[in-house]
């Protein structure tokens, strides 16, 4: 007789295992599931575990040639989401053997590659991943990390200041370099290529790199401080990207940047390796993130993209702001900011952190706050993000009625005033506006 019956089989018979005790080497995932009407939560959770690991819709002859029990993903817990009808958090454990070492690309292909189009689900969102040290140790992570970057730049005890050069498209290389110089001379630490500045007809990358390097060295000589500009090395091929990074290194600039989602994790990890080997810092921009993380009930939360980036490698990552948003969002933002820069982060559901994450000794990433912030936000930003952050003001620098350099001066003065006030024990939340007003005299 035949060894098994043909036909469609319930996933939960194999993949829903509430009695399973997770191993410390397992990769754990928390999924927010919205099953189709009539699909039980256990079946939906089991389906997610199956389709993102060893399963298919039926038993196959070749299942007999391997040990499913050793390799299968397991849905080990399901809890309803408070305040939502028909939404559940499904917890899935994956054996470490399912993943290629040192490949964020493979990890994401396995966990979120296929299952999100699954018919039995109306929507699915990966809320969090627990990366065990046994896996994270196969990655080198950020090229340098927060501490090494501070040492390279010789800047301590305060957040760093940046500015994206606007108008982001249309300036010639010479004028672009001039704008960079004005900002850095005024007191910023960094300026930045916009994420869509690559190598367009109005400004080819090589010309931009040259004029920006000139601006860096001139402003460095005048201020006696180390200056940087995130030169965007993102390109259409990995070879071209590395060629741009090599040229940046030959010019002697301190930092390059990459759009890690549009460029892809494979390209990003290659660039991070190059930067580590050649002493370049790496700024990461998250262009395209909202396509993935904007919907509450479908996609991937940004904290998952942030963890993936820390493994793939970057020294800065743009992480949005918290100013003027809702309180709850502030806690969640701080949750993934800590996941980026701390060694050990406790599970805390109020901050959106579903698992305790131990990064062991993997270097941290500077979160970059940018997007619609200006000098009056400085007290709040200093208080919320603390010292290990980069505060990036685009329009908040270049929009100064007297020009870029005075705009940069205003930001630097405000930052120094806030840091000093905090160190003297003043309450930034209460006295913030007063502190800025005093400083502006």
Curated annotation (Swiss-Prot):
Subcellular location: Plastid, Chloroplast
HAMAP family reported in the protein's UniProt record: RuBisCO_L_type1
Record keyword Protein biosynthesis present: no
Cofactor: Mg(2+)
Binding site for Mg(2+): 192, 194-195
List of residues binding substrate: 114, 164, 168, 286, 318, 370
Cellular component terms (Gene Ontology): chloroplast
Active site, renumbered: 166, 285
Molecular function, one GO term: magnesium ion binding
Site-annotated residues for Transition state stabilizer: 325
EC number from the UniProt entry: 4.1.1.39
Name of the molecule in the record: Ribulose bisphosphate carboxylase large chain
Annotated source species: Myriopteris lanosa
Modified residues (N6-carboxylysine): 192
Assembly notes: Heterohexadecamer of 8 large chains and 8 small chains; disulfide-linked. The disulfide link is formed within the large subunit homodimers.
Modified residues (N6,N6,N6-trimethyllysine): 5
UniProt function note: RuBisCO catalyzes two reactions: the carboxylation of D-ribulose 1,5-bisphosphate, the primary event in carbon dioxide fixation, as well as the oxidative fragmentation of the pentose substrate in the photorespiration process. Both reactions occur simultaneously and in competition at the same active site.
Co-factor remark: Binds 1 Mg(2+) ion per subunit.
Reaction(s) catalysed (UniProt annotation): 2 (2R)-3-phosphoglycerate + 2 H(+) = D-ribulose 1,5-bisphosphate + CO2 + H2O; D-ribulose 1,5-bisphosphate + O2 = 2-phosphoglycolate + (2R)-3-phosphoglycerate + 2 H(+)
Single Gene Ontology BP annotation: photorespiration
Lineage top rank: taxon: Eukaryota
Further remarks about this protein from its record: The basic functional RuBisCO is composed of a large chain homodimer in a 'head-to-tail' conformation. In form I RuBisCO this homodimer is arranged in a barrel-like tetramer with the small subunits forming a tetrameric 'cap' on each end of the 'barrel'.
Keywords (A to Z) from UniProt: Calvin cycle, Carbon dioxide fixation, Chloroplast, Disulfide bond, Lyase, Magnesium, Metal-binding, Methylation, Monooxygenase, Oxidoreductase, Photorespiration, Photosynthesis, Plastid
């Amino acid at each position: 007789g035949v060894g098994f019956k043909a036909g469609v089989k319930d996933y939960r018979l194999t993949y829903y295992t509430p009695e399973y005790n997770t191993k410390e080497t397992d990769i754990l995932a928390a999924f927010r599931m919205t099953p189709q009407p009539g699909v039980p939560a256990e079946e939906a959770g089991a389906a997610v575990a199956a389709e993102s690991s060893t399963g298919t819709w039926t038993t196959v002859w070749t299942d007999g040639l391997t040990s499913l029990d050793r390799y299968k993903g397991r849905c080990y817990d399901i809890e309803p989401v408070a305040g939502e009808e028909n939404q559940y958090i499904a917890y899935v454990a994956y054996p470490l053997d399912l993943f290629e070492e040192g490949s964020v690309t493979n990890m994401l292909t396995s966990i979120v590659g296929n299952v999100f189009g699954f018919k039995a689900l109306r929507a699915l969102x990966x809320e969090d991943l627990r990366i065990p040290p046994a896996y994270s140790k196969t990655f080198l992570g950020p090229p340098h990390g927060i501490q090494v970057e501070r040492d390279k730049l010789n800047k301590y005890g305060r957040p760093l200041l940046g500015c994206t050069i606007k108008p982001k498209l249309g300036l010639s290389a010479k004028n672009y370099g001039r704008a960079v110089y004005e900002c850095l001379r005024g007191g910023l630490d960094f300026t930045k290529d916009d994420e869509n500045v690559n190598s367009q007809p109005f400004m080819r990358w090589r010309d931009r790199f040259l004029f920006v390097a000139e601006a860096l060295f001139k402003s460095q000589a005048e201020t006696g401080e180390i200056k940087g500009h995130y030169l965007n090395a993102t390109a259409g091929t990995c070879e071209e990207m590395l060629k741009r990074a090599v040229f940046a290194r030959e010019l002697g600039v301190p930092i390059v940047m990459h759009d890690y989602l549009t460029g892809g994790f494979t390209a990003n990890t290659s660039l991070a390796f190059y930067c580590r080997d050649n002493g370049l810092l790496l700024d990461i921009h998250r262009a395209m993130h909202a396509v993935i993380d904007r919907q509450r009930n479908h996609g991937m939360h940004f904290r998952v993209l942030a963890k993936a980036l820390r493994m793939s490698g970057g020294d800065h990552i743009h992480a949005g702001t918290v100013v003027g948003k809702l309180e709850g969002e502030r806690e969640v933002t701080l949750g993934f900011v800590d996941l980026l820069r701390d060694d050990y982060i406790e599970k805390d559901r109020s901050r959106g952190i579903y698992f305790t994450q131990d990064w062991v000794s993997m270097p941290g990433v500077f979160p970059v706050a940018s997007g619609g912030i200006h000098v009056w936000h400085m007290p709040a930003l200093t208080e919320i993000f603390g010292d290990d952050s980069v505060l990036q003001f685009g329009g908040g620098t270049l929009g100064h009625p007297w020009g870029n350099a005075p705009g940069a001066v205003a930001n630097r003065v405000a930052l120094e005033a806030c840091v000093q006030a905090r160190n003297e024990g003043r309450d930034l939340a209460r006295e913030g506006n007063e502190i800025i007003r005093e400083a502006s005299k």
